[in-house]
From Swiss-Prot:
SMART domains membership: AAA
KW RNA-binding (keyword) present: no
UniProt name for this protein: Sigma54-dependent transcriptional activator SfnR
Induction: Under sulfate limitation conditions, it is transcriptionally activated by the LysR-type transcriptional regulator, CysB.
Annotated function: Involved in the dimethyl sulfide degradation pathway. Activates the expression of sfnG and sfnF.
Gene3D superfamilies: 1.10.8.60, Homeodomain-like, P-loop containing nucleotide triphosphate hydrolases
Gene it is expressed from: sfnR
Length: 366
């Protein structure tokens, strides 16, 4: 049985979602064959899969099968840093580059030099950082924050996402050119519910692992427990399976895990399907407008305009650039309208001339 596990030291795994991966199911075996074909190359790889499907484990396996196996493997969760810190974390910074930068520090690209950099949750990167990442991938060099000196790097980039980047591109949240740069090779990791042949081998691995930790003797799965595991949909994938097995070992009493020992969640995650063809969105808007018309409010246009802007601003996590792109407006117009509706506070140090200029900007038109 082909089994992948994370390194023993948790400090070596900075983006833990699943701690083990097997390739017993036919779908997993096909993935493994594809993985073994592309791993020796230097091509960028985009790994797509739900949370808990083992994306980091697959990335590590690619690294171990490549010519960079003796170099560093650095895993970075792009969603773990604020927008103000992610640039310094990825590309490094010089002393005094920002408040608190008391010394120069290499970024993750420099740390991974000669090896592999795994960027998990790549879809969470802010657009300005996506531009800089694209340049790094094209030029093979980084410029630290607060510096003008470029530093050559030799890094293979593997990226992963649990969202559909094509939809993010259409929504203006992800750059199309960066997508094609990262997506030289695509590896699709199927959720656990779609590869039932992996469930019992994984369960037995976790039983052995936790039995050793707990000081237990051999533990078996009853036939009914096995059937229950295979029939469950596993919305949390491998990570959920590991937690269920851990709990079952704490409650089973005779060296056999029974069906009643398996505490399965009642959580049902609604997965977004493709919208059917038609005018569903337009119909919803028409119904909403009809209700507003019935109220016969004299300032309806302004209410709708302000509500649209506020909603878009919050949807974009209060990012002006993303909001402007989503609405198809310039940043100046967006900023001026956000100030007008009280979503932004004007900097008191701005001069009178800038205030006059802002007031001349054309109002948002829906």
């Amino acid at each position: 049985m082909q089994l992948l596990t994370l390194p023993p030291s948790p400090t070596l795994a900075t983006s833990i979602r699943a701690t083990a991966q097997v390739f017993e199911d036919p779908r997993s075996q096909a993935l493994l064959a594809h993985l073994q074909q592309v791993a020796p190359s230097e091509a960028s790889v985009l790994i797509i899969g739900e949370t808990g499907t083992g994306k980091e484990l697959v990335a590590r396996h690619i690294h171990n099968l490549s010519g960079r196996r003796n170099g560093p493997f650095v895993a970075v969760n792009c969603g773990a840093f604020s927008e103000s810190l992610v640039e310094a974390e990825l590309f490094g910074h010089e002393k005094g580059a920002f408040t608190g930068a008391l010394a120069a520090k290499a970024g993750w690209f420099e740390e991974a030099n000669g090896g592999t950099l795994f960027l998990d949750e790549i879809g969470d990167l802010p657009l300005p950082i996506q531009v800089k990442l694209l340049r790094v991938l094209q030029e093979r060099e980084v410029v630290r924050l607060g510096s003008r000196k470029s530093i050559p790097i030799n890094v293979r980039v593997l990226a992963a996402t649990n969202v559909q980047l094509e939809k993010a591109i259409n929504a203006g949240h992800f750059r199309e050119d960066l997508y094609y740069r990262l997506n030289v090779v695509t590896l699709q990791l199927h959720p656990l519910r779609d590869r039932p042949g992996d469930i019992l081998p994984l369960a037995r691995h976790f039983i052995r692992s936790y039995s050793d930790r707990l000081g237990y003797g051999p533990v078996e799965l009853s036939a009914k427990a096995q059937a229950k595991l295979v029939e469950y949909s596993w919305p949390g994938n491998i990570r959920e399976l590991e937690n269920v097995i851990h709990h079952s070992l704490l409650t089973c009493g005779d060296g056999t895990v029974q069906a009643q020992d398996l505490r399965l969640s009642n959580l049902r995650i609604e997965r977004q399907e493709e919208e059917p063809a038609g005018n569903g969105v337009e119909d919803l808007l028409q119904r909403a407008f009809s209700r507003l018309y019935e109220e016969q409010s004299g300032d309806l246009y302004e209410k709708v305009e302000n509500a649209l802007l506020r909603s878009a601003y919050r949807f974009c996590h209060y990012n002006q650039v993303h909001t402007a792109q989503l609405l198809g407006l310039s940043r100046n117009i967006t900023r001026t309208r956000l100030i007008a509706i009280g979503e932004l506070v004007v900097n008191k140090r701005r001069g009178q001339e800038q205030q006059v200029l802002d007031n001349r900007v054309v109002r948002l038109s829906i």
